[in-house]
Amino acid sequence: MRVVAAPDKFRGTASAAEAASAIARAVVSRGGTAVEVPMADGGEGLVDVLGGPDHTTEVTGPLGSPVRAGWRLSGGTAVVEMARASGLVLAGGIEGNRPLDATTAGVGELLRHAVELGARRVIVGMGGSATTDGGLAALDAMGPMARYRGVEMLVACDVRTRFTEAAEVFGPQKGASDAQVRLLTGRLERLVQVYLERFGSDVSSLDRAGAAGGLAGGLAAMGAELVDGVDLVAEEVRLDELVAGADLVVTGEGWLDATSFQGKVVGGVAAYAAAAGVPLLVVVGGADEEAAVRADVVSLVDRFGEDRAVAETMACITEAVAERLDDL
């Protein structure tokens, strides 16, 4: 049996690579062959699944203090995660963040540095942001736009939110009060006109432009292409070729809900498996009832209890997959 292991991270308990290895151990224990393909959808973990960081640069953090951000440059392609420069974790989470002050300047500094070092193609992951500045600070930090002519910039998004909706949809998750959400929304509405005048680009109607508090829209204004992150990663790792001829595809994530099938890893991998006519198994930390009926789902919490599922996530993944393989 040939199995493709293509999970997302189990947030807080297992990286995508660790989850893929746990799946592979189960397959090998049952005499099969596993292909490990850790996945990401544009959120945290993008750099890791595309080869891992091989550069570290000191940049402006989300609240102004310097941070050291890892990123990758290989064969003229740079991979940058906004979370490593301007992420919510770096701001101290919801409790520590200052939503009106959080800045994407560090992302712009990374992009400038990547191009200065020779990148002609740049992939930028949007997930995990602390910011709702519409990308203005990033654009300012990037310097003269002329240096980006001829550079292909792909913005990997895991949401389809519009630019001016970013504060309302995601602001509370970043610690913004109702009053701050209104202020941030007004900021984004003004930036629509700023970008129209500066770049001749109307970002107000672009799907995905609200990703990372509007950073995606800011980058789109200067010429970047906004794409679904999971599809971009799938193309980079040639998931379609790996799935072809497989007997089973196993994916998973920490929590399964309706959004898992809307631009996230589980839904993306499921689509590739369906297109190839290959059975799919979804292993998750937990799941809501409605989402769980949309695929063959194994919940670690339901099978092993919450305490063990959290404390021994990788062992539980291996055991759950092995049990399901025995049933095939």
Description of each model-found segment:
Residues 1-328:
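N-terminal loops that bind phosphate or other acidic moieties
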